[in-house]
């Protein structure tokens, strides 16, 4: 039976308190979805662990006063708290999920990373090139999937896997 099959790495089954329905939560990316995530561990272009050797992602970064470098192309000195940064990130996620805004336009307007000029596009990368929490979230996402808040030394990210 398909429901008894093992979930892909990072995924767990949960019960929604509001609707009483089962949903799936990825503790690596903080993504949640109603549909059961599909595991694909035996197709071409993968490394030995059943994941692609490289992924391509875009992101929206919100820095805060505790970020490794609390400045950006948008603001010389960032003074917002980590909690305020998380509120901004959660607001952007809601706007994207509701269809009010698209990821790329929000990234180009509000990301504290210079990749904002490329609508958040970071290009393709392999393991070992990004900070570990960012890398783990990126590789756990499926193409077209968006993460929840991802915390790194740089700040708080929303990641969209594009390839």
UniProtKB/Swiss-Prot annotation:
<feature type="modified residue" description="Phosphoserine">
    <location>
        <position position="108"/>
    </location>
</feature>
<dbReference type="GO" id="GO:1990757">
    <property type="term" value="F:ubiquitin ligase activator activity"/>
</dbReference>
<dbReference type="GO" id="GO:0031434">
    <property type="term" value="F:mitogen-activated protein kinase kinase binding"/>
</dbReference>
<dbReference type="GO" id="GO:0007088">
    <property type="term" value="P:regulation of mitotic nuclear division"/>
</dbReference>
<dbReference type="GO" id="GO:0050821">
    <property type="term" value="P:protein stabilization"/>
</dbReference>
<dbReference type="GO" id="GO:0005737">
    <property type="term" value="C:cytoplasm"/>
</dbReference>
<dbReference type="GO" id="GO:0030512">
    <property type="term" value="P:negative regulation of transforming growth factor beta receptor signaling pathway"/>
</dbReference>
<dbReference type="InterPro" id="IPR046357">
    <property type="entry name" value="PPIase_dom_sf"/>
</dbReference>
<dbReference type="GO" id="GO:0071456">
    <property type="term" value="P:cellular response to hypoxia"/>
</dbReference>
<dbReference type="InterPro" id="IPR023058">
    <property type="entry name" value="PPIase_PpiC_CS"/>
</dbReference>
<dbReference type="GO" id="GO:0036064">
    <property type="term" value="C:ciliary basal body"/>
</dbReference>
<dbReference type="GO" id="GO:0098978">
    <property type="term" value="C:glutamatergic synapse"/>
</dbReference>
<dbReference type="GO" id="GO:0050808">
    <property type="term" value="P:synapse organization"/>
</dbReference>
<dbReference type="GO" id="GO:0016607">
    <property type="term" value="C:nuclear speck"/>
</dbReference>
<feature type="domain" description="WW">
    <location>
        <begin position="5"/>
        <end position="39"/>
    </location>
</feature>
<dbReference type="GO" id="GO:0007266">
    <property type="term" value="P:Rho protein signal transduction"/>
</dbReference>
<dbReference type="GO" id="GO:0051219">
    <property type="term" value="F:phosphoprotein binding"/>
</dbReference>
<dbReference type="GO" id="GO:0003774">
    <property type="term" value="F:cytoskeletal motor activity"/>
</dbReference>
<feature type="modified residue" description="N6-acetyllysine">
    <location>
        <position position="46"/>
    </location>
</feature>
<keyword id="KW-0131">Cell cycle</keyword>
<dbReference type="GO" id="GO:0042177">
    <property type="term" value="P:negative regulation of protein catabolic process"/>
</dbReference>
<dbReference type="GO" id="GO:0050816">
    <property type="term" value="F:phosphothreonine residue binding"/>
</dbReference>
<keyword id="KW-0413">Isomerase</keyword>
<dbReference type="GO" id="GO:0032794">
    <property type="term" value="F:GTPase activating protein binding"/>
</dbReference>
<dbReference type="InterPro" id="IPR051370">
    <property type="entry name" value="PPIase_Pin1"/>
</dbReference>
<dbReference type="GO" id="GO:0001666">
    <property type="term" value="P:response to hypoxia"/>
</dbReference>
<dbReference type="InterPro" id="IPR001202">
    <property type="entry name" value="WW_dom"/>
</dbReference>
<keyword id="KW-0963">Cytoplasm</keyword>
<comment type="function">
    <text>Peptidyl-prolyl cis/trans isomerase (PPIase) that binds to and isomerizes specific phosphorylated Ser/Thr-Pro (pSer/Thr-Pro) motifs. By inducing conformational changes in a subset of phosphorylated proteins, acts as a molecular switch in multiple cellular processes. Displays a preference for acidic residues located N-terminally to the proline bond to be isomerized. Regulates mitosis presumably by interacting with NIMA and attenuating its mitosis-promoting activity. Down-regulates kinase activity of BTK.</text>
</comment>
<dbReference type="GO" id="GO:1900180">
    <property type="term" value="P:regulation of protein localization to nucleus"/>
</dbReference>
<dbReference type="InterPro" id="IPR036020">
    <property type="entry name" value="WW_dom_sf"/>
</dbReference>
<keyword id="KW-0597">Phosphoprotein</keyword>
<dbReference type="GO" id="GO:1902430">
    <property type="term" value="P:negative regulation of amyloid-beta formation"/>
</dbReference>
<dbReference type="Pfam" id="PF00397">
    <property type="entry name" value="WW"/>
</dbReference>
<dbReference type="GO" id="GO:0008013">
    <property type="term" value="F:beta-catenin binding"/>
</dbReference>
<dbReference type="GO" id="GO:0005634">
    <property type="term" value="C:nucleus"/>
</dbReference>
<dbReference type="GO" id="GO:2000146">
    <property type="term" value="P:negative regulation of cell motility"/>
</dbReference>
<dbReference type="GO" id="GO:0001934">
    <property type="term" value="P:positive regulation of protein phosphorylation"/>
</dbReference>
<feature type="region of interest" description="Disordered">
    <location>
        <begin position="33"/>
        <end position="54"/>
    </location>
</feature>
<dbReference type="GO" id="GO:0030182">
    <property type="term" value="P:neuron differentiation"/>
</dbReference>
<dbReference type="Pfam" id="PF00639">
    <property type="entry name" value="Rotamase"/>
</dbReference>
<dbReference type="GO" id="GO:0045944">
    <property type="term" value="P:positive regulation of transcription by RNA polymerase II"/>
</dbReference>
């Amino acid at each position: 039976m398909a429901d008894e099959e093992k979930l892909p790495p990072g995924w767990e089954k949960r019960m929604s308190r509001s609707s009483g329905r089962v949903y799936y939560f990825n503790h690596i990316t903080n993504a949640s979805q109603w549909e059961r995530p599909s595991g694909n561990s035996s197709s071409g272009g993968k490394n030995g662990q059943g994941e692609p050797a490289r992924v391509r992602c875009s992101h929206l970064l919100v820095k805060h006063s505790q970020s490794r470098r609390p400045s950006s192309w948008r603001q010389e000195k960032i003074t917002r708290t980590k909690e305020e940064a998380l509120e901004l990130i959660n607001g952007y996620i809601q706007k994207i999920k509701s269809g009010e805004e698209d990821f790329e336009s929000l990234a180009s307007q509000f990301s504290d990373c210079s990749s904002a000029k490329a609508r958040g596009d970071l290009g393709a990368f392999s393991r070992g090139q990004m900070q570990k929490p960012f890398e783990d979230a990126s590789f756990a996402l499926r193409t077209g999937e968006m993460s929840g808040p991802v915390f790194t030394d740089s700040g708080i990210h929303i990641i969209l896997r594009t390839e």
